């Protein structure tokens, strides 16, 4: 697999330790501050909390002229549109990752809170970096 894209996963056997929060913070920093082409793959079935947050944010923006103006100003200031957030089961995440590798500098993966989910161990093995938030 020859690629320049970096794969970074956040994983922990325990729920509620901040995997999703850290994923969003890292992705946002890399994208908006460092100017990297970023994508997030939310593999944390069934909650898909990052995707749910993005959906809720977009619904709120659609209803609020103030938020629309803020989004426009952010785009003007950074030159960056919002990075994509995709969902995938851990068993299909490598296919998703390889599709993104040609268009992204960094892809972040929010993994489920158990390595017992099918595909999680294989996904971890194929990451460039693995962060494990602890409380």
Regions found by a protein language model. Name each.
Residues 1-135:
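P-loop NTP-binding core
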